[in-house]
Amino acid sequence: MAGAASPDHLFGLRYSFYVGAYQAVITGVQAIPARAALSPDALAERDSLLYRSYIAIGSHQLVIDEIGPGAATPLQAVRLLAVYLSGGAGGKESAIRKLNELLADDAVGSNPILRLVAGTVLMHERDYAGALKHTNSGGTMELLAMNVQICLQMHRSDHAEKQLRIMQQLDEDHTLTQLANAWVDLVMGGSKIQEAHLIFQDLSEKYPATCLILNGKALCLMHMGNFEDAEGLLLESLNKDAKDAETLANLVVCSLNLGKSASRYLNQLKLAHPDHMLVKRMSSAEDSFDRACQAIS
């Protein structure tokens, strides 16, 4: 008689990470029993989830300090992500150069976490074609979900739908499939907005109310013209993380539609996330306005 399968101690950590419950991941790692016999691959996955969660809550230096030069490839990649996100221009260039060196190494270049980090960094650089080069071959649900995000950023919802169909064929009920479905629905608009709202509502009943889920629900409500209820969800999200980029950006948009001042949220966004797309767009608009004023003065 075959022995019972060993428990998957990382199952809950993965899903907490997917929905943005980063503190739950950090706490959950500590709760894994010391007697749990994790394989080397499982140990690397556990640590990558842990350190990616620390990055998500802004603890970049902790990640840089704790991951040594002899760490496994996935952890080296995660450390480079922390370096990229915490550094100035020099740090970013150094991180990208080292990532490219790892990607060019036939022995480790196909590692899924390495490719995921490369895709993340290049998305920050707005090099979407370059990001897709590393993520397009898929291999994990996270990589497929990133493909959907990249295609949507490239305004190729047709390609995003193709990637979504691949995810649905693999596991229609997977949380990342549901999230990707909601992202596509939000871009498609129309009747799809209600479907996206139902997805986020379902996720909010399964998981804690994270910034990711609250912002998803709020975006749906804003698309439906319900800015007051959207504002309530966004303020709840702001209470969870006062520096969350998407919460601040969505509060700017929501406040403007409610006829309220958005300057405080915009200033917070500029301070915490100066490279955010909304900040750059508004700065560009201000520059264009100033030039127009100078031209007619």
UniProtKB/Swiss-Prot annotation:
The keyword Coiled coil does not apply. This is Coatomer subunit epsilon-2. The keyword Transport applies. It comes from the Eukaryota. One of its GO terms (biological process) is retrograde vesicle-mediated transport, Golgi to endoplasmic reticulum. The coatomer is a cytosolic protein complex that binds to dilysine motifs and reversibly associates with Golgi non-clathrin-coated vesicles, which further mediate biosynthetic protein transport from the ER, via the Golgi up to the trans Golgi network. The coatomer complex is required for budding from Golgi membranes, and is essential for the retrograde Golgi-to-ER transport of dilysine-tagged proteins. It comes from Oryza sativa subsp. indica (Rice). Coiled coil: none annotated. InterPro entries: Coatomer_esu, TPR-like_helical_dom_sf. SUPFAM superfamilies: TPR-like (SSF48452).
